[in-house]
Structures are given as structure tokens and as C-alpha cells.
Amino acid sequence: MKKRVLSFLFIITLFSLTAVSASAVVNDTLKVGIRWGDMALEAANLENAVGSGYEFGYYDEDREFVYLDETDETTITMQASGSGNDVTVTETRSGEVLFQFRDNGYCLGIRPMGRHTETWCKGYKYPGGFEYRCNADGTLTVINVVNIEDYVKGVVPYEMDKDWPLAALEAQAVCARTYAVKTRHPSLGFDVCAGTDCQVYYGRNRATDMTDAAVDNTAGEMIYYGGKPADTVVYCASNGGATEDAANVWSSIPYLVGKKDPYEAKTNIPNYNWTVTYTADELTWILEQKGYSIGTVKNVYVAEFTPMGNVSKVTFEGSRDSVTVKGETCRTIFYSSTYNKSVKSQRFTINGAGAVSGGIYINDSNTVIRSLEGVSVLSGGGKTVRLDGSASVLSASGTSTVGEGQTPAFSKDGTFTITGSGSGHNLGMSQYGAKAMAELGYTYDEILKFYYTDITIK
């Protein structure tokens, strides 16, 4: 059994520690941040899943592993030591020092011995190797250095239900692969993170034969626009009945164009319709925390809808001032961890704005809804259809349209009820919509070309 204490000094000055390519994929390899920032570790443990040891070295500018030494031990711990990116490697149980890495331009790299070996790190099983970057507070940023196809195999079952139809999983694989090719976190030393800021990735824990097949079937395929990989391939859980133009949420992106989505209505979506209620005091506090000092909130209403029926402007009127927010802020401004409340999508109404004051009675006097958004009804032609927020109905006083309008929602009891459908920013592919299309027999490329305008897949 090899237990060596080695110290290496590298005279390497040509490449900066923070230099990461603008294109994330170098030699088909990604650097994925799995523990960083507040999640960085004082001591980082690894356990080889198959009982083999590890090689010590570093990853060069081409992401090729440069071998320095090895150990037969299967459980090891890394801790920052000395200055710069100096790291000490010990055997986890005994504390015996196995390797001492001293840097002058690179970071410690570790990879398991053997081909296709997987390694346990903080309860998750990862393919590939690891890189360790020392932080000023003595913690370690842990980076998984992994082949892009193995990375996608780790993303798909965390971003989409692993038991969904193959075509939906294939569409998700192409989206995940395309998203990953643009570096998102160069200042942190990795390309993409493993959290919701990028794409959820926890290695191999949830992978199945089906999710792996979705990646293998689409190997190397990405979404292209204008001859280049599309660099903003975003997706959402569900859109509530319509996607949105990116210009109305973030900024203009030519392949993210709003359109009515007839497919979500064809599958079961848990918690598709939702309601959240805020008090005036809660909204006042939330706005103040986000830098809007308008006094006590007196009124909140949707000031503008997009042609797709999504919200593009929300106005808050206070005792001292008023403010109108636009785009994605219409949704995110309502988020509060303190009150554990949020608005789930861009598709909503507030009190009477876009709904009928006091609610709409359906079937009998005991069933009341506040919005027609997402409601299924029997049409004059005898078909069941899902409404998108308004409809013409025959009442005792004649035909009229309900569910329309942007009337300010003055609160009589100091509360504001927001009713909506869908989950997410309403941009790009609806994951539930992809599921529905797959169930109807559409292929993954047909799914992607519905949700992303004028793209090619290659």
C-alpha cells in the first residue's frame, strides 16, 4: 500500500488560476462547481465507489490530467494548508498524510484509478475527477472535472422526472448539453455550477437506463441558432398555457418567442393552478427589503399584460409613492423567505384584475373560482377546452366577457390575492409540455422546434 508524503513546487506562470475558456467545453471536459461560496468545505472527503485508489496531480490548460503520484487508499480528505492553493491530503480515518500539494499556478487535481470509476462526495456519486481551489477563509471550492456527456447524464434525471417518456428526456438532454457549453462562472474557476442558478447536477445517484439512453441517443447534439450554439437555452416546469417573448421578461432573444401552448392541457400537472395571499404589511416589508420605499402599500395591480396573457408590468401604490416593475421582476419581487411566499410564474392576476370581483360561480353556489386561467370548460361544439384567462358567457343580462381587464385591485380587507398557473419564467421549453408532446408521439426534435423558434439541432 502506497503512503507517500511528497511535496512539489511547480514553476508555472503562463496561465492564470482564474483563466477559464469562454467556451466551457475543452477536450469534451467540463468543470462543474459542486461546493463553492457558502457551501465550500473546510475538509473535503472522497470515497472511491469501487475500492480502488487515487491519482494526484493537476489539470492543465487543456484539462488534461498531469500525474504526480498515487495512493491505494480509498477514503481521503483534503484540507487547505500553507498559502495559495497548497492542499494536504490525508487518509480519512487515521489522519496520516498521503500527499502534499504546493502550487504556483495550478490547483490540486485528484482522479480515481481505473476506467469509468465513480467517487462518493458528500453523499453523491460522481464520475470523473476533482479539482480543489483554496479560498481566503481556508475553505475549499470543490470542482467535478467531468466529460460533458457524463455531466448531462447527471443533469437529466434531476431536471426532469426519470420516468417520463423517452422523447421528453431526449429533449431535456439536448437542452442540458447546449446550456453547458457556455461558461457561466469563470471568476470562480469553473464553467457551470451544480445548483438551480445553472442546472441541477448531483452526479449519478438518480441516473437510470432510460435517462442514460436519452443522453446516448442524442450524443453531441445541441440547439443552434444562426449557425452557433444557442447560449440561452432555458426551460421552465410549466408555462400556464403560453410561453413568452424573452424581451418581455429579460431581454430580446430571437429563439425565445411567446406562443400559446396547447400541450400542457393534455397532461396532468400537479399544482398547476395556485393562489397566494399577501397582507399590505407583508408587501410593505418585502418592498422595503428590496429597496422600494413607497410607504404602506395601499394597492397592487397588474398594469400590463403581454399579447400572450402573461404579466409584463405590476404597479404598487403606497402612502408616499408608487412604483411599477417590469419583466421577470413582476414575479420575483413577491418572493420572501421570511414569509415563505412567492409568485410561481409570469401568468397571474391580482384580486379583481383579470378576474371577476368576488369570484365566478361554477356548477353551483358552493364552487367559486377567482380566475378563468387554466379552467377546463365544455365549449359550444361539445369539446373540453382549457381557457387562457377570459371567455364570453351567456348570463341573465346577455353575452359578456369575464376574466378580462386590468382594473386596479383595491383591497378592502388589507389583503391581496394572486391567482395564477404554471411554474417558472415562462421562457423556452415547458418540461410538462414536453412530456405531453412525447405522450402524443412527438419526437425530441419536434418538441424542441415547437418551443424554440427557427433553430436547428445538430
Language-model features: locations:
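Conserved, single-site charged/polar hotspot
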Residues: 2-458
